[in-house]
Each structure stands twice: as C-alpha cells, then as structure tokens.
Amino acid sequence: MTITCPKLKPVICLKSLIFSVVIFPLCSLAIGESLPSIPDIDYKLIDNFSAGDNSKLWVPMPGSQPVEVINHSGHRVLRLPCNFKGNLIKRASWDKNYKLDLSMCKGVQFLFYCPHSAPAATFNIYFHSGKGWYSASFSPQTHKGWSHITILKKNTRIEDKPAGWSRIDRIRISAWRSLDEDTEFYLAGLGFYGSGSPVTVVRADAYAQRNFRTDVTVSRFVGVMDDFLNRAGIDHLILSDQDIKAAKLKETSLLILPYNSNMPEAAVNEVAAYLQGGGKLLACYTLPIKLQRLAGIHIDELIKQKYDGFFASIRPAKDPLVGMPVVTEQASWIINSTKPIQGRSRVAAWWYDNKGASTDFPAILVSNNCVFFSHVLLADDSSNKQRLLLAMMGNLVPGLWQQAGRGRLDQIGHFGPYRDYAAAVAGIRGLAYRNRSVLTKLESAASFHTEAESHFQKQDYTQTILCAENAQKNLLEAFCMVQKSTPGEQRVFWCHNAFGVEGMTWDEAVKVLAENGFSAILTNMLWGGAAFYPSELLPAAPKAKEKGDQMKLCLTACQKYHLQCHVWKVNYNMGWPTPDEFVNKMKALGRTQVTYDQTARERWLCPSHPDNQKLEIESMLEVARKYTVQGLHFDYIRYPARDGCFCDGCRERFEIFLGRKINRWPQDVRSDPEINKKWLDFRRRQIDYVVKEVSHRAKQIRPGIKISAAVFPNWPTDRDAVGQDWQKWCKNGWLDFVCPMDYTASNWEFRHMIEKQRTWAGAVPCYPGIGLSSSKWSDPTDIIKLIEQINITREMNTGGFTIFNYGLIEAEHILPRLGMGITRNPDNYK
C-alpha cells in the first residue's frame, strides 16, 4: 500500500531549512537524561513508529548502532545513538523502507531533540527514489526541548537520478561526524507537510539531474518564483516534472513553468492534457512545441542582448495586462523571441532598453489559456516584479487577485520579532525614543494600512497590494532606523565582480559603501588563471583590457572615500575568467587536477604541483608590490573535495613524502588507514605552504598589510575533507583575520557556528561571513534577517562581520537601510 499526501491546511513553515549546516551545543545535559515533554502533534502522520519492530525496521549502516524505541508522553520516540568516540565512521546513519507518494505534498515534518549536538557536524534526511536521492540538512532551534523541523521538497538537493517524489521507497536519517565524542538524538511524529494548493509550480527535476550547474540553475529560478509567490501571499505547491499527472491537477487553477528546459515527453503530454481539460498555464522562457500549439503562441529563436542594457525593462503594450506596472526593471541578457498567433494571442508587454527605447521584442504574450514571459523572472526590482507576476496570474485566474490582496494585508508588520501589524507598531514605537523620523515612518505606515484595508473592501485589489507594500516599506524602514550602531567594528563586503556593481562606476559603488558605514571591501581581482589588471604572471580576463585596470579604479575610489581595499584571489580554481588557451596549456603540462576515478578536473590547478604553488604565491605578491592595498584575501584556498587530487604528479610527490611506493594507486590511499592519515596530512601541507609564504613575504613587501581568508565553517572536518587547516593558520599568525562562510538562514545555527569558530581562531579576529546573496538564503533582500545576524555577531563580540555579496540589489536596497541604523557611522565617510 502506498501512503499518499492528505489534503491538509497549510502550516506556516519555520524557515530553518538549509543545505549545509554545522551544529554546535550550548548545554551540558548528559546523554540519556529524561526527555522533555513532546508538544502536541496536529498534523497527519506518515509514521508514529508504533507499527512493527522499529528497532529492527530502521537498519543501521555499517558501524552505526541500532535504534531504540521509547514510549514517552504517550508517543513512540526513536532514540538514535551516535557512537563517534574511537570509531572511524564518517556518519551514524539508519534506513527504513517505505512506500510513499509525496508528490502533492510540500514536504515532511517531524519533532527533533538533541541535548548535545557538537559531535555532529550536520544532520541530514534523505528520500530514496529510483536510482537516486533527495536530501536536505536541518538544524535544531534549541537544545532545551523539541524542535519542529520542516523539510520542504523545494529545498532538497538531488543526488544521482531519483525517479520522482511519487516513488519514495526508503528514508535515511544521518548525523555526520564532527568530534570524537558520542551523542544521541531523538525523533517523533514523522508526518506530511502541506498540500492542496490552487497554484502549482513545476520544477524541472529531470533537467536538474544532468549536472551540478543545471541543478543550481533550476533551483535558482524556482526559488525566485517561490519567493515572489510567498511575498504575495499566494498558496502554492512545487511539483517535480517527474510526478506530473493531469489527474492530480484537478484542483490546480494555475500551472507555472518557471524554467523548464528539456521537459520530458511524458510531462509534456500530462501538461497538454491539463490544458485540454481547461487548465491555465504561465510559462517562462521555454515551452515545448506541443504546448505552444495548445497555448496559441509561437516561439522563434533565442536572442542575445546586442549590448549591456539592451533588455532592461518590461513595459505595457497597447492592450496590457490589468494591474501591471508602468515600468518593471529586469536586466536580462537573453530572451526567446515570440510571435502572437492572430485570433489566439496578443502582445501584452514589450522589452525596452536602458535608454527607454523599445527593442521591438515582445516580453509577454497572452492567450485565453496561457501567459508566456520571454525570459525567466529575476529577483531585481522585486516590488514591481511581484505586481507584474500577479498581473500575469490574475489575467488567467482573476480570483488570485483577492487572495493576493488578503495575503499582502496579513503580511504587514509580520517580520523579525513581530507577528502582525499591531505588534510591529508597538515594538518599533517602544524603541523609537521620540525619534521624530521614526514616528513619521510609523504614521505613514498607518495611513497606507488604512488605505489598503479600504481598497480591499472595495475589491480594488491592485491598489490594496500597492498600499500594503507601502505600509510594509515604511514599517521596515522604521525598524531599520531604530537599530543601534556599534562604532569601531569591521564592516566588510565581499564583491565577486571585478568590475564592481553593474551599472555603477567603482567610485559610485565604493561611495555607497562608505556613506553607509562600511570599513572595507574584499574585491575579487584575480583567479587561478586570470587577472583583471595588468599582470606579468596571469593572462588578462575577458573585457579586462577593454575596461581598463580594475584594481587601480577600485583602489583609487577606496582611497578617496577612506575605505580599506583587500584584494581577493580565487586560488587554484581557474573558473570562467581564464582563457581556454591557458587552461589547455596547464592541462598539457600536467598541472590540472584529476579526481579519484581519474576524471580530469581541467579548471582546477593541482595544489601539490610546485609550479602551481609558485604561481599562487607570486601572483598574490605581485598585487602587494604594485598596489597600495590594505590586504590580501584567500578564497578557494583548499581542494575542491575529498576526491582530489589524484594526478600522476600527486602520486609521485606523495610517495616521496611517504618514503615508499604505493602498490595500488589511488585505492590504497583510502583503504589503508595509515596511508590515508599521511595522505590527509600531505594535502594540508600543500595548502599550508602557500598561506605561510604569502603571509610572510607580503609583510616584507608591504609592512602592515593584512592577510585574511574565506574559509569553510567546520574546521575539524574541513581540514580533512578539503585540506583547509585554518585553525593552524590562525595559531601560527599567518592570518590577521578570518572570515568563515557561515551561510545559513538559521539564526540559532549561525550563533553556534560563531561560538566554536571564535575558539578555533584564538587571538585572530573572526569576522563571520553572512550569506545574504548565497543560495542558502531564499530572499537576497531580507534586511531583517541580515540585521538579526549582524546583531548576533555583536552579541558574540566578534568585532566585525563580512557580507556576501556586493551587487546592485545590495547597493540600491540593502546598504541604504543598513545605513539608517545598524551601520550608521558618519566618521567612516569623510
């Protein structure tokens, strides 16, 4: 019997799910102490662990101990012991066979308790389907009681080739090792999470399975669509294209294809059946020919932008969508050209360039059952983009306007510590201390809130949404204004783009940072095989010659506005900027990496090759010699993963290090514990050498220069996994500050990562990396989450923080709001 998703009332998700977490303790509870009381379970269960002998049904992986079933508070609870002490297992893990159809659910939920979580680096849940897995990490929100964990399908990673959420045949629970200490954790109430939504978003899982890049791309654009729908208050479900069945879509009033390249034929046929049955479709960028015919539109060919800013905005046609903005900005680089079919579809919007001229390319086509947008939805201009999306949806399903209006009203004031409008007003007013500017913002919010309610009663939902957004904007800005600034701390932004912020000069971009109280920028000016300034060692990156010496432009601006300039290098990874000629040369010379299975990793330089070490060192020292920078910053100063590098040169150099030949290469490196231990030490030494040499020699060249590194967050495991022994770098004085990449949306987890990292860093300042625009944050404009994590760094006395990544959204929307309060420091700008 297959267990399928019930029709449930959606539950608000605790936004604690992330893809990579590190768990740390705050308690000293002894293992085996009495369990806290279990909270009420008000959701449909998949498994209450009462059927059969769960101590045997949950099968431990080799090296793990059996589970124990406990009766507690009227519930059956799993106790899962993690025997890490003196045990070489990488994880404690258990499997149980199921037969589940989770296709029409949003995910699963369960109760989790771990009194001492430090020995576990991460907790993971896996769902087996076909020939692959869906996986997700999770973290507890407290050590004192049970955490309600929600695993959303949309946030899971794909491993190998799963066959869809309708074919789940096994669940695995794992705790990955961090410390040589035993612990245990408990599970109760494994259940379904959410189903029965009027809007269904189709995720291109079949395409995502091709490789890591396609998975990231699919996740990105599904994430943007999901975020806009959440902000609009539109209840929706994300469905795998491997699970589409027209029969399952009977309650779906609108199907959305956010980015569905190479849709499987079976899925195309099911969507076609859905349309033929009267369904409505919103599609972005691509659409199979069969569906084009049913939708009454025609797609011609891909059109790349003729110049930067060619596709800059979307503007209404003569017969536009009701409620669409006059101008919606979107910096697209490519579109699919489209044509309406006479009598069946029309152009509702056109693409305009950054000078305000029409490109004569349609942006939106509309038919009686379909709206087609000729590119994917991007996250820029989020307020107008959300209204544009609602206009496209409302054209097909008018009832969604009312739902969105009500949703936006209910969201006013629901942010940070506040649950509704009244709580937000009261809380902010209590922090205002008669600040007239803050009180004025609150008055404006009240006025817009009243107008929004009035428009809703009049069924004018477009104005309801507009007024609700303005009310929320004023409340958010009032909240930003009451935040306290801490003078003297290091406030740093990573900037991955060597040309700075798109649409701004380096002078303009640096000025925004300085005006809003930031003290330093880490700017990515060189990679493993490319430089964005005249270099005698590295080839010029694309457009570097055309656009000039970016290092000089950035440094000049930093000197003008008194901002520290630290130059960031992507080490070993040649990446996208490196010319193919240089990559091919490195490969021919045997200087690129080879994985354990002897697959070429052509764009990664081998860290043990002496010439590569010399290139890494000398290229960074070249910057210190040529430019009066305040610092040099390492990134990717590691191996990509455990499976590298196993080239012939690595074998030769490792055998010299080992003092003998290896009979079976590379098998003995993993199968022989003693050789493996030496191998891990060998890898670390290659990375250590580069850090030490750059640190010592750069300070001889430019006394006072600061050396820093962006590092993985969990030193005890990462020193083995990727050869990054950053505690040693701090202890030996090779680093002047360290920036662990603590990219998580969980404040609890963020806090406990920092607690451990400060210990590992010792006397070296630790400026935690906040992942504002990383894939771990669902919303890159979440100023509230950013403020919360900045405040956590202050509570932990780090003396500073580092934010990823400085771009246009950060310049236009994030920095001005930070500068209103939490980073307000006029002395930083002279």
Model-based region annotation:
Residues G196-T200, V224-F228, A357-V482, L815, ...:
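Extracellular ligand-binding/catalytic regions of CAZymes and related secreted enzymes
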Residues G488-V492, H566-Y627:
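Active-site-adjacent "subsite" loops/lids of carbohydrate-active enzymes
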Residues Q65-K90:
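Short carbohydrate-recognition loop motifs
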Residues C82-P162, R167, W176-Y186, G191-Y193, ...:
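Extracellular ligand-binding interfaces
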Residues N211-A295:
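Helical hinge/lid and interdomain linker segments adjacent to catalytic or ligand-binding clefts
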Residues K56-P60, K90, F310-S383:
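Catalytic beta-strand/loop cores that center a nucleophilic Ser/Cys/Thr
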Residues S261-I334, G343-V347, N354:
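A glycine-rich, often tryptophan-bearing local segment used as a flexible ligand/cofactor-contacting loop or short
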Residues W734-F750, Q757, V764-K830:
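Substrate-binding cleft of secreted/luminal carbohydrate-active enzymes
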